């Protein structure tokens, strides 16, 4: 059941405003001239941007924050905020309306002609691509996503048009609250084992979401969607697939996967639309692009506008984001933290290695540096993680990023031991400092380094880039790597 949201002028206060989902909502509200404040113990560039927009931000989550405000606000929390949080406890004591982040997003979805993108993987890329298409098509959409995009310099933009594009998260079950005009489902797998015990529970949440949508855009290449997702008899379903023989409404052929992107011919219900080009690598991103094509066509965009927009789209931050290169050592930052995502990202890395033949080196390698995210996920998918790194020449594994979990069900060393049964080159370096030291002693010209995970591992990239940029190349080349 949704909690009522007051858009009539009562202030909003976000506990944990610096989070990627919370900050996007705050951005949209303040752009609508609504009073917004928030707190976060870890300030970052996103909170700085909100401060520039006029948001009052408290640097700690303290009970006194609410007393310092001129009017008792509606208090917005995410699932990460627990009942023992002092600011939350004060909000309850003062009688402030308490809203879950999803209540606010659901209310915004109701106020627009909305497209909500759901799925275990690919949500951020697909939703940002759809938002970019609408922007290129002159629609001026409002966009709320779980990643940052250079095209609108952040994780949200507030447009003057009637459309909202939102990323719809399933991690805590709140996906069931959303009722958009168009709902996209990219795929369904078991994830978030801290909330779901089995795949059946995940399917049920997605079914509830699908049956709240006026139209569902669904990937027919996902067997769980195709064979197990049940929608209402009168539900409008638009399907997409990478295979013409699937019978999907949108499909492709003549696919060319390359180190700089992907080309394909797009078909719409048996009619050739034309050629599609994307800078994003791999089959998983071609599926994301095809979902964007389907949504664009539903909204009345011509294929020329759609194909031009997809060709120009650069992607979202931390989604195979090339952070820099020094002496032929390239660093890529990717949010992959589920075994399926890791396999897809490593496959894309293999594609990119093909473009690096200028480095004549017998040890040109794909180096995967991975920080597992959450004990529950690592424990549940221990075997799947162990088998996911087959495309990597070297795997460097850190300890597990807890993301607030306290029950240490499994240790990073245990995962490293299991991984070593399937992979010849696995190095366990528990801390970020140990990872940096190891990589400084190991990387060589021609290496493609994929920094993988949803935690803080990507913080190592700037120091490593600086280190290699200052070293003479002959010094790097003297030592033969593992």
Swiss-Prot record:
Keywords: ATP-binding, Cell cycle, Cell division, Cell shape, Cell wall biogenesis/degradation, Cytoplasm, Ligase, Nucleotide-binding, Peptidoglycan synthesis. It catalyses: UDP-N-acetyl-alpha-D-muramate + L-alanine + ATP = UDP-N-acetyl-alpha-D-muramoyl-L-alanine + ADP + phosphate + H(+). Gene3D superfamilies: Mur ligase, C-terminal domain, Mur-like, catalytic domain, NAD(P)-binding Rossmann-like Domain. InterPro entries: Mur-like_cat_sf, Mur_ligase_C, Mur_ligase_C_dom_sf, Mur_ligase_cen, Mur_ligase_N, MurCDEF_pg_biosynth, UDP-N-AcMur_Ala_ligase_MurC. It is an enzyme of class 6 (ligase). It is found in: Cytoplasm. GO terms for molecular function: ATP binding; UDP-N-acetylmuramate-L-alanine ligase activity. ATP binds at residues 119-125. It comes from the Bacteria. Pathway: Cell wall biogenesis; peptidoglycan biosynthesis. Belongs to the MurCDEF family. This is UDP-N-acetylmuramate--L-alanine ligase. The gene is murC.
